[in-house]
């Protein structure tokens, strides 16, 4: 479990990232060697900085580095203890998640519901069990996930019964599991997404692996079939069909793949791939850190309102800082005006008008 504040670091990987399908022992050795070379280059650069300092200043910086080293040792222990603490509480959460699963899927009934339901439900209406479309609505209420869920995905996601996540140690990372009821779209009862990390504390993604979905004929949601009428005069009178990939939440289970080492990849393609991998990680970490632990709050919309409120407060803080900056600029302008008047001069008209512009115009 993360605190949700980690950001995926893919910088420096570029086109040299090993094949995402599987890292061989040789690939891993090459990756480690590449990282070592990068670190050695950075160390050499740091040495140059130290050598450029005066002896007394250099000595002070060396002592500061020793202090930093002690801090890093403590931080490493913190990460170790945090992982153990998270594992402890994850086990304590499990019974609560099990109760949630049973209520959501109608396995058990909560106290007092049976009699109330009998009194309120019309005789001709079939009584619904559990909480219908619980996970679908929980995810739709999150801004990032709602952009991924297409209208045609919703019918399939109504069959989603539960979402779980597990930390994995070899290799480091985490795994998401999506449990589905029997449905008319695909055979799989469980769809998984696994993230392998080079470093968990400073998350650097090695690769992501998703389940291959076994779609029933004509039910694939990640592709659409286009039918085109044949040209006039053509001997073939049957419509021409063409299959194209389309946007879908279920593309999440087919993560971006890094090309093989021997394939050339230009800078633009590498940047595009990096952005795709970062977005994919954001979706996975959002489900892990926000949706799973606070599912009912996302279902009701409370969590979305809380995030909106936090965003408004952050914006107001930014506006206050901008206003303070503007006041400082105005004060400086007033001082300059006073000086000019003392000297018998006047502020040019153009400058005076510019000083009266709204703050947002100055920032453009």
From Swiss-Prot:
It comes from the Eukaryota. Residues 259-269, 304-340 have a biased composition (Acidic residues). GO terms for cellular component: chromatin; cytoplasm; nucleus. The modification Cysteine methyl ester is found at residue 361. GO terms for molecular function: chromatin binding; histone binding. A motif (Nuclear localization signal) lies at residues 227-232. The keyword Transferase does not apply. It holds the Pfam family NAP. A lipid is attached at residue 361 (S-farnesyl cysteine). Residues 250-269, 301-364 are annotated as: Disordered. It is found in: Nucleus; Cytoplasm. GO terms for biological process: double-strand break repair via homologous recombination; nucleosome assembly. InterPro entries: NAP-like_sf (IPR037231), NAP_family (IPR002164). Residues 32-86 form a coiled coil. A motif (Nuclear export signal) lies at residues 53-68. Residues 362-364 form a propeptide. Keywords: Chaperone, Coiled coil, Cytoplasm, Lipoprotein, Methylation, Nucleus, Prenylation. The keyword Flavoprotein does not apply. May modulate chromatin structure by regulation of nucleosome assembly/disassembly. The acidic domain is probably involved in the interaction with histones. Belongs to the nucleosome assembly protein (NAP) family. PANTHER family: TESTIS-SPECIFIC Y-ENCODED PROTEIN. This is Nucleosome assembly protein 1;2. It comes from Oryza sativa subsp. japonica. The lineage of its organism: Eukaryota, Viridiplantae, Streptophyta, Embryophyta, Tracheophyta. The gene is NAP1;2.
